[in-house]
C-alpha cells in the first residue's frame, strides 16, 4: 500500500510549523503524523516511506 502525506504550514502563537498528516486509503494514521519548524525537515521525514500529495499554506487564510 502507498502512504500519502499532506503537509500543512500553520502558525501557532506566532511560530510557523509544518505538520505532516499521513494517510492510507484516505484514513489518517495519527501515530505517523509529524511536525517540525522547517518544511525541509518535515518533507525529509515523510519521504522515507510516503508520497507527498498536497501542501497547504494555512497561514495565507488567516486574517
Regions found by a protein language model. Name each.
Residues 27, 34-59:
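A short, charged, amphipathic alpha-helix used as a generic interaction element across diverse proteins
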Residues 1, 59-63:
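Short intrinsically disordered terminal tails
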Residues 14-32:
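A short, structured beta-strand/loop element
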Residues 1-19:
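Short N-terminal "domain-start" leader segments
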Amino acid at each position: 500500500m502507498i502512504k500519502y502525506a499532506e503537509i500543512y504550514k500553520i502558525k501557532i502563537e506566532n511560530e510557523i510549523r509544518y505538520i505532516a498528516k499521513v494517510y492510507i486509503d484516505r484514513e489518517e494514521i495519527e501515530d505517523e503524523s509529524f511536525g517540525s519548524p522547517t518544511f525541509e525537515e518535515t518533507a525529509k521525514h515523510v519521504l522515507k516511506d510516503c508520497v507527498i500529495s498536497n501542501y497547504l499554506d494555512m497561514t495565507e487564510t488567516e486574517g
